[in-house]
Amino acid sequence: MSALPDNLHTFASNDSDSQETREWMDALSAVIASEGPERAHFLLEQLLEHARENSIDMPFSANTGYVNTLEPDQEERCPGNIEIEERLRAYMRWNAMSMVVKANRHNPADGGDLGGHIGSFASLAHMFGAGFNHFWHAENENHGGDLLYIQGHVSPGVYARAFLEGRLTEDQLLNFRQEVDGKGLSSYPHPKLMPEFWQFPTVSMGLGPLMAIYQARFLKYLHARGIANTENRKVWVFCGDGEMDEVESLGAIGLAAREKLDNLIFVINCNLQRLDGPVRGNGKIIQELESEFRGAGWNVLKLIWGSNWDSLIARDKDGALRRIMMETVDGDYQAFKANDGAYVRKHFFGRDPRTLEMVAKLSDDDIWNLRRGGHDPQKVYAAYAAAVKHKGQPTVLLIKTVKGFGMGSSGEGKNTVHQTKKLTDEDIKAFRDRFNIPIPDSELSKLPFYKPAEDTPEMRYLHERRAALGGYLPHRRTKADEHFTVPSLDVFKPITEATAEGREISTTQAYVRFLTQLLRDQSLGKRVVPILVDEARTFGMEGLFRQIGIYNPDGQLYTPVDKDQVMFYKEDKAGQILQEGINEAGGMSSWIAAATSYSTNNRIMIPFYVYYSKFGFQRVGDLAWAAGDMQARGFLLGGTSGRTTLNGEGLQHEDGHSHILAGTIPNCISYDPTFAHEVAVIMQHGLKRMVEKQENVFYYLTLLNENYAMPGLTPGTEEQIIQGMYLLQAAVGEKKMPRVNLLGSGSILRESMAARELLAADWGVAANVWSCPSFNELARNGAEAERWNLMHPTDKPRVSFVAQQLGAHEGPVVASTDYMKSYADQIRAYIPAGRSFKVLGTDGFGRSDFRSKLREHFEINRHYIVVAALKALSEQGVVPVATVAKAIQHYKLSSDKINPLNA
């Protein structure tokens, strides 16, 4: 039925020789019958090529007709008890509806409206039923478990099922969207909030499809590298047709086809509605998505019509019904389900006398009950069965449904259904009657949840089906069963030692050395996942190409142009590097897949994703937030960091705020190290926390491309480095000399070191220089102490780490970084009382130039640090204010220079 496009029938009215047309059609049918579809496909391709060679314009279409892909005789029959499944589905619909309506009747004085959605689950309950009952495996000794990316707005339906299974209590359902007291259910799928239930956060629409593609690829990667057997696992992704407008939803479908991810199944719930109205009122979203996915190389299965349409379509000998199906736009299809059978008879079948005659013997109720494919359990099962058996391509199921199915006049097919959270007593009664829920009228006002007795056929069936599939879903593993011991810091001694005289390196080089050393570790080396976005040569990592190879499922089918070089570009079926190309969202999605592997695969992996720091949190911040929600563990490395450290690149590349963005994610631990030993200490400690202790944190380090001598680790400062601050250079000079404390991080710490020399030589001021690898960690520590003191007023106050460090070192404080002032200014509240605190930073747009010019422009070089220190001392009455003016003149600084914020 679907092999030929419906517009073929439109051509029939212009057919000048119908007999010849019929002969061609009969010939093709004979080939299909005798030699099979492959031969027919070959002949058609030859005919099309011959037509093109003869200059016949053949417009391309990736579309098939507006009918089901599977013919009725191609459908695998559902082995389940459809009657029992329908009853269970009805109970879940009722409990999901009840949960949402109850949540919006609570505490009217407090607003009363907690939100929730009824219509979304109503539209795909049949799809979930087929999956949970027949297809979705839980993790067990024989199966690694299928991974489910569940459409966020349908969470009430998933909770309703878990309630029947006995995994959630009635008290938890009553506390839907009431989590503060610790006994409620999260609004949407959030692993952070329900760590043993939800696996993937999906309600930031578009991220689910994107992350799932890279998750499926990561399963293939693990299998290819022999780390885990993932052959029988599937990744199922549920998303709405409106969600596909998010650029992330379709942005990576080419990769899925290119890498032949036949373990990936998209199920797009085509209820034709988004939040406000139709997805494509004037068009056909199913046809549009079919062309997108088929054109990208996916296997596309369309499920549009239910079983009771089959006989009508079989009788459609002249194509009149197919033509109307194709010509009717989605806005009209939505209207049909918002009205009744008489309306459908007139406005759909009534468009052609032939189709009107086809339904002449059907009542209006019969016409109304002509279901869409997504509400037919047999059709859904058959589509799923075909999808799981398909090899060599990812599959997308385009399944047509009705938003708010079963809600009747309260929302079914209406533009307002997404916002329908409250139902009248009459609406509730109609819902009960529609789904035959055994609750008497006398109880309806209480909206009780319904759960059959455990010994009923329905409940036995419910548990039997999940037992057959290995257990209950969704379910999330919180820790891996395996254990590793992280190499001691001594293993990384070449990085923690001072560089040889005359030798200069960057912190990026220090990172690469650390990574290379870790790759050599016998136990952890194979678990390292280096992730690149086409910048390996920028970061000096091209040496890894030959050493560990770049993963490619096809291997290397060509001879690389640099084959004769030591560091040639090597792709390998078992390669260890994930090279994503110019694709930060893909890099971050691969990082998330690896960083959550302890949970999804029971395999601890250690991802290191390095990229231009400006193109991290700013570009893929929503994915970083999702990583926090998913309790990711791994390293993000922001290379070429800082507003003034990247020579010549300019406004779009120079990063002055990634640490501020990193600080918004509670479980992101961020550092801006200056020296190689700091990089080694921080990363080794991060490994201890994430790998050895399996703590749910991830690390962000900024790396520099500026070369200089490295001083080496001073024993005993390791813990202070981790906490975010240690004394790098103590003040030298007579006790009577004015004293100041210079704080810095990243490349600008070295400007503070130079300022220390100028203060002593030019102004007789002694300065302590403090390396502060993390103002974020210092701020969190201070806030924690302040909070504890607030809530324990009668106890001995706790002292912030900043105050502890500075307490014994008198003098004002000047903090300078290559980031916006608000980064270092976070610790202002924790500076010891009575101290002046000055902050220098890089507020404003970046621009291209040399480092020295940029640091002068942003007023963060050694001269400005000296002036800030003198100004702070003058405010405390230690030096005359005239000295400040003299310093400005001495260093030739312009007092009337434009503020770099506005430059």
Q: What is the predicted role of each segment?
A:
Residues 2-165, 431, 505-521, 525, ...:
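N-terminal amphipathic, basic-rich helices that act as targeting or association modules
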Residues 179-201, 207, 221-232, 250-452, ...:
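Thiamine diphosphate
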Residues 110-114, 126-135, 141-145, 196-200, ...:
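Short alpha-helical segments and helix-capping/turn motifs at coil-helix boundaries
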Residues 75-96, 100, 107, 121, ...:
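Non-catalytic terminal/interface segments that mediate subunit docking, oligomerization
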Residues 79-92, 96-110, 117-259, 282-283, ...:
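Cofactor-binding active-site loop characterized by glycine-rich and histidine/acidic residues
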Residues 10, 27-30, 77-85, 104-116, ...:
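Glycine- and acidic
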Residues 237-238, 266, 531, 637, ...:
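Residue-level marker for buried hydrophobic side chains located in beta-strands
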